Amino acid sequence: MITGKNYIGNQLSAQGDITFKTFNPLLNIENQWHITEASQNEVNKAAELAAEAFKTYATISGVKKAQFLRAIADEIEDLGDELLEVYSSESGLPNGRAMGERGRTLGQLRAFASHVEEGNWVDASIDTSQPERTPFPKVDLRKINVPLGPVLVFGASNFPFAFSTAGGDTAAALAAGCPVIVKSHPMHAATGEMVSSAIVKAADKTGMPNGVFSNLNSSGIGVGQQLVRHPMVKAVGFTGSIRGGRALYDLAAKREEPIPVFAEMGSVNPVILLPKALNNRAESIAQTYAG
């Protein structure tokens, strides 16, 4: 069931006064769900929970994190055809694309589970000391990758599964030991809620700390800006336009404590339809373009 609410840790919440609806581009109508935008209080609560969860989650073994990631994949798979139907109603994309993208997403989660289970990602390096070296002794140098802290992930418009709520950015952050706050994309917020429910359920089943995952809704830029500026957020993952990514980068750089923005940015590719082709083959062109 789609509630239209935000996930603040493992709790559904709808404190905001603003609601919006997603759009079905195939039927050219609004979808029925009322999505509630996150309030400032909910933004703060999600960030605080993530920071608190980080204290525990950062120390959890790779084996336990792998169990969590695999449980997420299993729970998403268990959502079955209903998830695919909601995906198509918000994206207009056909069932075949939905199934393919879901499969890709499950594969990403399970691949990161195997990677974190092996432990090679920490890239440990030990350069032992040589105190007897002349003219200066050599110091002992040791290096290892460690989690940064809570990561903010922005859902992408064109990949509701693979680059959004449980997509590659989320899987990578969780594998590294970083709690995740997702700013859902307003074009597929209901799909995001269903996937969020799977993540929250997986977290509960595998004993993860409350706040390891949150999902916040917004149709504008305010919630995203608040999250990027929040001192408890330590990194940002973004897939989208150059303009949007640059704006987030600038916000992150202007913080008292600047944070990294890992962004895949691109432009809109022009598609030219000539009048004769549009008159004769409009439906088939639209299906090919969407699929």
Give the label of every model feature segment.
Residues 1-136:
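N-terminal Rossmann-like NAD(P)+-binding subdomain of aldehyde/semialdehyde dehydrogenases
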Residues 28-29, 65, 87, 177, ...:
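Residue-level signal for inorganic ion chemistry
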Residues 109, 192-195, 227, 248:
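Hydrophobic packing residues within well-ordered alpha-helices of enzyme cores
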Residues 123-206:
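Conserved small-residue-rich beta-alpha loop and adjacent elements
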Residues 140-141, 214-237:
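A structured beta-alpha segment of the ubiquitous adenosine-cofactor-binding alpha/beta core
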Residues 176-181, 207-210, 228-235:
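Short, surface-exposed connector motifs at secondary-structure boundaries
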Residues 182, 215, 238-240, 261-264:
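General beta-strand structural signal in soluble alpha/beta enzymes
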Residues 198-201, 244-291:
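ALDH superfamily catalytic-core signature
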